[in-house]
Design a protein with these regions (language model features):
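Single conserved hydrophobic/aromatic residue that forms the stacking wall/gate
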Residues: 1-4, 8-11
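Flexible helix-coil transition and linker loops at the boundaries of alpha-helical arrays
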Residues: 10-13, 34
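TPR/TPR-like alpha-solenoid helical repeat scaffolds
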Residues: 14-17, 50-58, 82-84, 104-125
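Alpha-helical adaptor scaffolds
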Residues: 18-29, 33-86
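Non-membrane alpha-helical secondary structure
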Residues: 25, 32, 101, 107-111
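TPR/TPR-like (Sel1-like) alpha-helical repeat modules
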Residues: 41-46, 69-70, 83-107, 123
């Protein structure tokens, strides 16, 4: 989930929108990750992490997300990155935490190719099977 371009203000005195940032978000939405990253690199925010993650720069993405505010979304993305990096226990812990914050993450993880294997392997969210 992208952070909207309206969230980034270039000049705190005039509240002038950062049009370059808006362009980068547009690139992300169009899956033009290299172009997005060129603009986003200095921001070091969630969208920068999404661009890194989409290009396979998992350690860079994880570094940024670990320093970001811990929401269900950021913890979910960290779970994916940890799974990619072979840190299964950390991935499971982050996924469970994300699901505690937002129940929709359980459903999402079952459909996610990078996390559904961990869900099955560790028997996560079994109580969801009851209904």
């Amino acid at each position: 989930r992208l952070v909207g371009s309206e969230m980034c203000i270039r000049d705190s005195y005039t509240n002038e929108p950062d049009t370059m940032y808006a362009r980068a978000v547009d690139y992300l939405e169009k899956r033009k990750y290299e172009q997005a990253l060129e603009i986003l690199r200095p921001y070091e925010d969630v969208n920068t992490a999404i661009a890194y993650m989409s290009l396979g720069y998992d350690k860079a993405a994880l570094r940024i997300l670990e320093q970001s505010s811990q929401t269900a979304e950021t913890q979910y993305m960290q779970a994916i990155l940890n799974a990619r990096l072979g840190n299964e226990q950390r991935a499971v812990s982050l996924l469970l935490s994300a699901a505690e914050m937002d129940d929709r993450m359980r459903f999402r993880a079952n459909l996610d190719p990078e996390l559904s294997l961990l869900v099955k392997k560790y028997g996560l969210f079994k109580e969801d099977d009851l209904w």
